[in-house]
Structure formats: structure tokens, C-alpha cells
Amino acid sequence: MSRKPIIAGNWKMNKNPQEAKAFVEAVASKLPSTDLVDVAVAAPAVDLVTTIEAAKDSVLKVAAQNCYFENTGAFTGETSPKVLAEMGADYVVIGHSERRDYFHETDEDINKKAKAIFANGLTPIICCGESLETYEAGKAAEFVGAQVSAALAGLSAEQVASLVLAYEPIWAIGTGKSATQDDAQNMCKAVRDVVAADFGQEVADKVRVQYGGSVKPENVKDYMACPDVDGALVGGASLEADSFLALLDFLN
């Protein structure tokens, strides 16, 4: 089953609106056809209006880095999935380890967010990943499998087939340490196997699984050669236009 790759840059808390606009203008005309790959950037909430506007006539898709699970209400500081859809966002990244760690988000929160994102016609990119301690204890597949099952609970098979799962080992995020090709393949396959167990093999064959964690132009080709890796969620290398575009060289 051929799945279209998806390369998504996660800017995290970087770039002001002017910098976001300049980045989009630098990459937009150089992106490959959407027949070959989906390309997205996850912009901070303060940059979304500018980024969506700058990207609107290009193939570049735009993700929010988080949202709440309610559309409106007395939730000071939160981002409405309904408004994200009205603004023209395509994806929402949820469950990133930084959100889980610093802001104490639970699997239940992430599951509620996934449902709210789908209810508003957007696509979630759901992150999962283990700590170094869990990895070294040989419990990575078990731990990540539980995260994935909990995040997808109550979604329809059709919804799961259309979403993106991003496996990011916490010990490889922004550390310069990256998982080996075998680690990435084995864990992305483990993620897919959980989907197969919960929703059937047909759904598992359709869902796209990204690898994330110190992905760079120099190693992206190795990861993309893995049969169960359908893309990358990229932090640092997505901040500069040149390095972001170089991530797409795996197509050549």
C-alpha cells in the first residue's frame, strides 16, 4: 500500500509574523507537487493568520501546534479548534512531549482534542514517544502503544485512517541524538501494529506514521527508506528555508 509521505516542520515557539511570512515566501514556489508529498509547517498561534495567508496560493499546508477540546467558552489562553478551521488551518499537532511534560497533558486530554479536531474538519497529527529511561528498559513499544491506543479511543476507522501519527522518542528531540534507522522502523511499525490491533489491518495500512527527533537533511533519506516511516516531524531543521527544502531531497 503506497502512502503519500508527509514532511511537517514544527517551529515550536520561534518566529514572529514577519519571519513566518518571509519563510513561506522563500519556500512556497520551490515545493514539489502534492502528488508526491504533503508539506506542512506548524506555526505558533501568534503567527497562524500570517502563515495561512502567505501559504494560501501554494501547496504548503499549515498546522497549529495545539488546540483545546472545546470550541468556545471561558478557557483563557486556549485556542479554539473551530476558529482554527475558520482561519484555514489544515492540521493540528497534539500530544507533543513538550505539551505532555511542561503542561501536564494526559492521554485523555489528547483523545478529547483529537475528537474536537475531527469535529471541525481538521486533521490531527498525534505525537507519541518514550523517555530514555523507558527506551533503555526495553519498554518503548509497550509505552508508546498505550499512548496510541488511548489517543485513538472512540475515533472511527475512517478518522484513524486519515490522521497522522508522529513517533518522537523524547531522548532524540532537540538533543542531536537521533534514533537509528532500525529504531525508527521498529517503533513506527509498532505504532502501526497497535492501529491494526485496534482498528484492523486495512486502517493500519492507510494511516501515516512520521518519525521525529533530530531529523536533518543528512539523515532524512535513511528514515524515509524505512517501510513503516511515512514522513518526518522536524524541529530545528524546519526553521531555515534552505534546510527545510533540503529535507525534501529524499524524493530524488
Curated annotation (Swiss-Prot):
EC number(s) from the headed UniProt entry: 5.3.1.1
Q: Say if the entry is tagged with keyword Isomerase.
A: yes
Matching entries from CDD domains are given as:
TIM
So where's the catalytic machinery, residue-wise?
Answer: H96, E168
Give the highest taxon in the source lineage: Bacteria
Q: Which compartments does it reside in?
A: Cytoplasm
GO cellular component terms?
cytosol
Q: Name one GO biological process term.
A: glycerol catabolic process
The UniProt keyword set, sorted, is: Cytoplasm, Gluconeogenesis, Glycolysis, Isomerase
Query: Under the GO molecular function aspect, what terms does this record hold?
Result: triose-phosphate isomerase activity
Q: What pathway does this protein act in?
A: Carbohydrate biosynthesis; gluconeogenesis; Carbohydrate degradation; glycolysis; D-glyceraldehyde 3-phosphate from glycerone phosphate: step 1/1
The record lists substrate as bound by N10, W11, K12, G174, S214, G235, G236
Tell me where it mainly resides. cytoplasm
Asked if the keyword ATP-binding belongs to this entry, the reply reads no
Q: Which reaction is the catalytic activity of this chain? A: D-glyceraldehyde 3-phosphate = dihydroxyacetone phosphate
Subunit structure, interactors included:
Homodimer.
Functional summary from the UniProt entry: Involved in the gluconeogenesis. Catalyzes stereospecifically the conversion of dihydroxyacetone phosphate (DHAP) to D-glyceraldehyde-3-phosphate (G3P).
What family does the Swiss-Prot or TrEMBL record give for this protein? Belongs to the triosephosphate isomerase family.
Protein name per Swiss-Prot or TrEMBL: Triosephosphate isomerase
> What gene name is listed for this protein?
tpiA
